[in-house]
Amino acid sequence: MKPITLVSGAAGLLLVTGCAGGSSSNADADLTVAASFYPLQYVAEAVGGDNVDVIPLAAPGVEPHDLELSPSAVRELSSADLVLYLSEFQPAVDDALVSTQSRAFDAADAVELRPAEEHDHEHEDGEEDHDHGQLDPHFWLDPTLLAEYATAVGQQFAQLDPDNSATYIQNATDLRAELTALDETFTSGLEQCERRDIVTSHEAFAYLADRYNLEQVGIAGIDPETEPSPAKLLEIRDLVEETGTTTIFTESLVNTSVADAIAKDTGATTAVLDPIESVVDDDDYATVMARNLDSLRQALACA
């Protein structure tokens, strides 16, 4: 793990459309930490407890890739003690960090990101292209990697606030234990299944698939807005028919039209598999992961 990166910081941030929600301000906190999207916020809140005021940059239910920051929001970045972010995942955050030169911690310094799978796609002008050299950001869908990140965040908080270091380290240890238990539940729940192929809206589930011995087939690549090529669509339809796939997985924040069409053409059904980039209402990481496991077990006919 690399040391704290002095690239930027963030406080309560406003989206172009308004204030990011999801966490109330804690005026008595010892640290103010901004989290650029939900999984990082989840870890920060669990590890920081009452000692940390966690400010979410992205509003609940909003696609974090599309985050935009107003000039006033960028100005407020510099007032936080630390910003938690993932480089190259949200360009607006990267730009704000460069301009403010405040303290930040990149999740890529805590966990090893895997290369994105190469994926044929088409631009709006119809030209076909490929993904090259891109890293897959969705590490949090493997609970063991999120546990590694939690440990690193605990160390970061302890460095910034030594008086509460024991609390941060203990909270990180407790969260790691919870995530380890979740991993064990997934392992046992997906151990004996009739099928192991999952067709997803975009390639967000490679970490989960690798961890639990599944095969991901993404309709789109790492970028959920990318249109799949005709060849890719034909490949997916053939795979669905050849493997007896019964479910095409969709996402609440991604357009479902292509997935719906594939399901209609092949006689499959659709179900939500959530990449947990954002949450709404009373959901949190654990509750959404539990629903994901239920959806996978039903789709894959697991014992």
Identify the meaning behind each predicted range:
Residues K2-G12, V16-A303:
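Extracytoplasmic metal-acquisition and chelation regions
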